[in-house]
């Protein structure tokens, strides 16, 4: 078995950007998941724009307990400098609206969409037929 050598990686931090939300360093040892050729190992679950801009997480999962709105999706995508997975409904928001919000999120640049339980399989199927980005389904 080969001994894994630790690479010396130069780190640059500015005075104003030195205080960020850092994921645990052990995350770098995991395999992660590859989406569209980009390996993602860490996800930050937030809609807080200040946190989105000040983290070293590889991606953001942005889900909130209100009816999704295209303007909120746009603001989250614009704020993120890493891939973002946006909530598009599934609780109160159902049916064609979920599919339309998913398509809107794809057009705005989201890497994926999140639907909440109790989203029906039919809605997930319709979403899959309409968009070409990953769909994350939460469970309770």
Kindly label every feature range from the protein language model.
Residues 1-44, 73:
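N-terminal amphipathic alpha-helix/helix-capping segment at the start of soluble metabolic enzymes
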Residues 31-39, 59-62, 84-88, 113-115, ...:
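Hydrophobic faces of well-ordered beta-strands that scaffold small-molecule active sites
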Residues 64-79, 93-98, 116-132, 140:
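Active-site-adjacent beta->alpha loops and helix N-cap segments on the catalytic face
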Residues 26-29, 51-54, 78-83, 103-104, ...:
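A short alpha-helix capping/helix-coil boundary motif
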Residues 40-51, 95-104:
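Short, acidic/polar
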Residues 47-67, 104-112:
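Catalytic domains of carbohydrate-active enzymes, especially glycoside hydrolases
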Residues 8, 19, 54-56, 100, ...:
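Detector for Asparagine
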Residues 59-61, 73-97, 101-108:
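Active-site cofactor/substrate anionic-group-binding motifs, chiefly glycine-
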């Amino acid at each position: 078995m080969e001994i894994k050598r630790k690479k010396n990686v130069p780190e640059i931090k500015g005075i104003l950007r030195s205080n960020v939300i850092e994921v645990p360093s052990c995350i770098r040892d995991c395999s992660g998941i590859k989406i569209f050729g980009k390996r993602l190992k860490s996800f930050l679950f937030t809609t807080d724009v200040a946190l989105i801009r000040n983290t070293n997480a590889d991606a953001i999962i942005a889900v909130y307990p209100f009816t999704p709105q295209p303007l909120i999706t746009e603001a989250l995508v614009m704020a993120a400098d890493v891939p973002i997975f946006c909530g598009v409904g599934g609780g109160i928001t159902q049916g064609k609206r979920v599919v339309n919000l998913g398509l809107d999120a794809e057009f705005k640049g989201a890497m994926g969409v999140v639907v909440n339980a109790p989203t029906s399989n039919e809605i997930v199927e319709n979403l899959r037929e309409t968009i070409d980005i990953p769909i994350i389904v939460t469970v309770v």
